[in-house]
């Protein structure tokens, strides 16, 4: 169903659907696509037929891994939806989706309330200032409790929900919602599966008598919040005058766009109830590209010089690439969010992040993995583009005559790795291609060659992440390979400072020799997502010629790759070049690079080197009778219990546990709790490994 791209940006919404892994996010998106007329048969996740889940593994596992971008239309408005994965191993997908969205629908499970992953995703959305509406889903589920879920939004997220709907009935008796803005009831009475319209029709009725008091109570709270936005409304409200529906909606919109409140709706996507009012709320309350602040970037030559781009087709062209995917027919697809200007297919643009020219090939607006070709891209929209060769996630594309670099995204370092060995020479070549393609798509996927064993090591964000990457290598690229056991990505750092360390590199073997003399200081520094190492030059009087100083830095960075304790990369080090000397004939960049590397290795040995390991934030939900066993087990894994809370019928235990102790945890937890407990885990931070454990790791690495 090809409809034209809307040029009136007031009628455009770029939104994401975000949630915990099982809150029903993909089902909700499927229903949106059904009601907006794009799919004719609803894809059920448990049939493996969901339209948005388009990679083979997604359909098998029933989880969404890649954020498919879809365009649909609702009441003459255009909604561009990005479906984001809720599994913690795929935080990078969520992060890059949020970066290019204007608003989001946070889907919560009506029984579980705010779950750990909902919290992680919510915090990521806070980071990018994304306005949200909340959809309490699965109201038909046994144990569903709308009011409990709203409480968890307050208590666990510290957010300010504004209830604009109440459920009519719950569990098997859930049949509709009360609209508190228009004070009416919407009911879906058809058989949830047999109804030909699949919930497309609903009745508008009077509010049921038994819910009238509750509706009045929540309506009063709603009006109070709304009236406070504006003096004129406040006067009207306290003067006893009725506020009009238009006034209420405008006030809710203003508060939502400013992220002061989060409207809460409810329904059951699976039972086709409550989805259309949620779509209305997307249009009524979430921002259009014109409601969000203009995009800021900086000058290509001067990072301090800020440039503003408004979402207007007359401004110079600028766009951010937020995802690269390999399409079975078209090859490399780059998803872009266009922030300003417009540009036609076939035009030349510049990738200002890399300083490379690119040509825009075919352009599509995507429906999951089907494509609707368009002739040009225009401000405020999301597109998939073919033909970009050098552009990767986070790069800026812009007008060659009017360049800008938009703020990119930061991605976490991988915490887990696995060795992979191709079975034949042909597989070795295929593996090379697979690695290159997958790394283009996924910035948290890294690879390296182990110098000693010659093995290829792939690194990722968790066991599921690596499983899926290996699975894709086998399926999409036909790589036959043996895969090792997952290994923890340890790091090394220093705890002490070495104020002065001298090193002279001298080599004389006839002809011109090599000479470099340096004095360095090394000290610990705080590690951030952007910075794990710093180099400072304090040499005065030209004692080390300027052209050799970058070589010292490069030598130290080389040495950081292979730590001195057990060969793991070193982080959290600041190195300062204090002094040195050069020889007119024998000094060279190579000599100073070697000196930098050797001086650092020697100094690091004296600087109290220690081993670091990834600590995972683990949350376990268990029935109370197994709580003692679960806590005992976490303690035996060197876990530190952080908190214990009550949630609906279960105990929630949060702990920090070293990743190395969490392999195989899912099976152990199942057997200890008869399969009734569930857990989730996300990367927390790096922490020092206790000495006894560190000694064992060092010995093992040296013995290999």
Curated annotation (Swiss-Prot):
**Gene Ontology terms for molecular function:** GTP binding; GTPase activity; translation elongation factor activity
Record's CDD domains?
Answer: EF-G, EFG_III, EFG_mtEFG1_IV, EFG_mtEFG_C, EFG_mtEFG_II
Q: Which GO terms describe its biological process?
A: ribosome disassembly
SMART domains hit by this protein: EFG_C, EFG_IV
The primary location reported for this protein is cytoplasm
> Where, per UniProt, does this protein localize?
Cytoplasm
| Record flagged with keyword Repeat | no
Domain tr-type G: residue ranges: 10-290
List keywords of the entry alphabetically.
Cytoplasm, Elongation factor, GTP-binding, Nucleotide-binding, Protein biosynthesis
User: What's one Pfam family the UniProt record gives for this protein?
Assistant: EFG_III
Instruction: Sum up the protein's function in the record's words.
Output: Catalyzes the GTP-dependent ribosomal translocation step during translation elongation. During this step, the ribosome changes from the pre-translocational (PRE) to the post-translocational (POST) state as the newly formed A-site-bound peptidyl-tRNA and P-site-bound deacylated tRNA move to the P and E sites, respectively. Catalyzes the coordinated movement of the two tRNA molecules, the mRNA and conformational changes in the ribosome.
* Protein name, entry field: Elongation factor G
Gene name of the encoded protein? fusA
């Amino acid at each position: 169903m090809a409809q034209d791209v809307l040029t009136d940006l007031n009628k455009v919404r770029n939104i994401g659907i975000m949630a915990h892994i099982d809150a029903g996010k993909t089902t909700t998106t499927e229903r949106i696509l059904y009601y907006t007329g794009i799919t004719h048969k609803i894809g059920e996740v448990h049939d493996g037929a969901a339209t948005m889940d388009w990679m083979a593994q997604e359909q098998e596992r029933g989880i969404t891994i890649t954020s498919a971008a879809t365009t649909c239309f609702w009441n003459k408005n255009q909604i561009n939806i990005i479906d984001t994965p809720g599994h913690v191993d795929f935080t990078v997908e969520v992060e890059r989706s949020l970066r290019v969205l204007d608003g989001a629908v946070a889907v919560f499970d009506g029984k579980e309330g705010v779950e750990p992953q909902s919290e992680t995703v919510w915090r990521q959305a806070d980071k990018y200032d994304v306005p949200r509406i909340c959809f309490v889903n699965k109201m038909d589920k046994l144990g569903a409790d709308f009011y409990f879920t709203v409480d968890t939004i307050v208590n666990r997220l510290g957010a300010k929900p504004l209830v604009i709907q109440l459920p009519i009935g719950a569990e098997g008796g859930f049949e509709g919602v009360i609209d508190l803005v228009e004070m009416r009831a919407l009911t879906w009475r058809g058989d949830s599966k047999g109804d030909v319209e699949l919930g497309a029709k609903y009745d508008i009725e009077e509010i049921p008598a038994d819910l009238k008091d509750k509706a009045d109570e929540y309506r009063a709270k709603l009006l109070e919040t709304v009236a406070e936005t504006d003096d004129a409304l406040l006067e009207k409200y306290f003067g006893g005058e009725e506020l009009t529906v238009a006034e209420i909606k405008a006030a809710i919109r203003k508060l939502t766009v400013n992220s002061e409140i989060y409207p809460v709706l409810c329904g059951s996507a699976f039972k086709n109830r409550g989805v259309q009012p949620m779509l209305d709320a997307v249009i009524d309350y979430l921002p259009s590209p014109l409601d969000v602040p203009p995009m800021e970037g900086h000058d290509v030559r001067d990072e301090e010089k800020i440039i503003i781009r408004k979402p207007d087709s007359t401004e110079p062209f600028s766009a951010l690439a937020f995802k690269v995917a390999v399409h079975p027919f078209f090859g490399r697809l780059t998803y872009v969010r266009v922030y300003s200007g417009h540009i036609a297919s076939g035009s030349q643009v510049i990738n200002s992040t890399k300083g490379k020219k690119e040509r825009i090939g075919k352009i599509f607006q995507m429906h999951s993995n089907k494509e609707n070709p368009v002739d040009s891209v225009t401000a405020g929209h999301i597109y998939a583009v073919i033909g970009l060769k050098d552009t990767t996630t986070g790069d800026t594309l812009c007008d060659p005559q009017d360049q800008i670099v938009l703020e990119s995204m930061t991605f976490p370092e991988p915490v887990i790795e696995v060795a992979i060995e191709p079975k034949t020479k042909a597989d070795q070549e295929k593996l090379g291609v697979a690695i290159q393609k997958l790394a283009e798509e996924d910035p948290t996927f890294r690879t390296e060659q182990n110098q000693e064993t010659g093995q290829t090591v792939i690194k990722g964000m968790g066991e599921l992440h690596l499983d899926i990457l290996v699975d894709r290598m086998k399926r999409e690229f036909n790589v036959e390979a043996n895969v090792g056991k997952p290994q923890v990505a340890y790091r090394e750092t220093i705890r002490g400072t070495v104020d002065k360390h001298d090193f002279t590199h001298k080599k004389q073997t006839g002809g011109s020799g090599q000479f470099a003399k340096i004095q360095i200081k090394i000290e610990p520094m705080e590690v951030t997502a952007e910075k794990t190492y710093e180099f400072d030059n304090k040499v005065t009087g030209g004692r080390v010629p300027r052209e050799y100083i970058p070589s010292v830095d490069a030598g130290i960075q080389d040495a950081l790759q292979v730590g001195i304790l057990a060969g793991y990369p070193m982080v959290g080090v600041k190195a300062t070049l204090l002094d040195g000397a050069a020889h007119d004939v024998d000094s060279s960049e190579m000599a100073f690079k070697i000196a930098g590397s050797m001086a650092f290795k020697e100094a690091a040995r004296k600087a109290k080197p220690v081993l670091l390991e990834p600590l995972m934030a683990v949350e376990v939900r268990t029935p109370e009778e197994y709580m003692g066993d679960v806590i005992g087990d976490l303690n035996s894994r060197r876990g530190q219990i952080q908190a214990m809370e009550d949630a609906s019928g279960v105990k929630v235990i949060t702990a920090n546990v070293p990743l190395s102790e969490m392999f195989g945890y899912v099976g152990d937890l199942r057997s200890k709790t008869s399969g009734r407990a569930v857990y989730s885990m996300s990367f927390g931070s790096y922490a020092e490994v206790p000495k006894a454990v560190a000694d064992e790791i060092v010995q093992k690495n040296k013995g290999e």
